[in-house]
UniProtKB/Swiss-Prot annotation:
A single GO BP: tRNA wobble uridine modification
Record-listed S-adenosyl-L-methionine binding positions: Y39, G64, C65, S66, D90, N91, D118, L119, N133, R200
Organism (species): Idiomarina loihiensis (strain ATCC BAA-735 / DSM 15497 / L2-TR)
Signal peptide (residue range): none
Taxonomy, superkingdom: Bacteria
Name this polypeptide is given: Carboxy-S-adenosyl-L-methionine synthase
Length: 243
């Protein structure tokens, strides 16, 4: 059973950089649903998009798979396609171990492999669908072009890249507004001012967000022919790029 997120509910003498450790694993489903507007809508829509782009005899990747919620959505989207394999990657061993338990609870004929490794070092091959669900924002900005290029190089023609991210608006006044609307969303979901401020302090050094334009330029630079935002709520957006 998912535990309630209280990690930042009490004053901390010092705030360490946020990391996906065992403490976060225990509360992650509650944390992400109360923190990311539209998260459930993105997961619910993933199978529909995956089903349009999955190819027989191909691989589907969930890069930064955390507890496997998107992995399950990907699997649902390829149920009618022959000989597919899903590969989930995460650099947090506690996340991978819990994801395996989660996936084992939902049996399927579609094989899923989970690997604990750095996605920047993951070989992508024979891919029809690759998902980065709130993952790229935690990768060093100087490595993001290389990550997307690596995905493109290992993707089959007609394949799809699905990227969901927190984004920054280029207009500072609009960006401030979207941040405040996001904080209101968290307040409405029970987070206190202390929790919001301490979480922000913990995450500001490890999560660097790009503008939508930067993402689209990165897709184009890698070689993707088409890209579009397919969902946005406040400063959280989901994008699709097609090879």
């Amino acid at each position: 059973m998912t535990q309630h997120d209280t990690i930042f509910s009490k004053p901390l003498p010092s705030i360490s950089d946020f990391c996906f450790d065992q403490q976060v694993v225990e509360v992650f489903p509650d944390m992400i649903n109360r923190s990311v507007p539209g998260y459930s809508s993105i997961l619910q829509t993933l199978p529909q998009i995956v089903s349009r782009y999955v190819q027989p005899n191909s691989h589907l990747y969930d890069l930064g798979c955390s507890l496997g919620a998107a992995t399950l959505a990907i699997r649902k989207g390829c149920e009618q396609t022959e000989n597919c394999k899903i590969i989930g990657i995460d650099n947090s061993q506690p996340m991978i171990e819990r994801a395996q338990l989660h996936l084992d609870g939902f049996k399927s004929q579609i094989p899923v492999e989970l690997h604990c490794q750095d996605l920047a070092e993951t070989e992508i091959k024979n891919a029809s669908v690759v998902v980065l669900n709130f993952t790229l924002q935690f990768i060093s900005q100087d490595k993001r072009d290389e990550v997307i290029q690596n995905i493109f190089n290992g993707m089959n023609k007609g394949g799809a890249l699905l990227v969901a991210e927190k984004v920054r608006h280029p207009d500072e006044s609009m960006n401030d507004l979207l941040i405040e609307l996001h904080h209101n969303f968290k307040r409405a979901n029970g987070y206190s001012e202390l929790e919001i401020s301490q979480k922000r302090a913990a995450i500001e050094n490890v999560m660097k967000v790009d503008t939508l334009q930067a993402h689209q330029q990165r897709f184009q630079k890698a070689g993707f022919q088409h890209s579009s935002v397919w969902f946005q709520c406040f400063n959280f957006a989901a994008m699709l790029a097609v090879k």
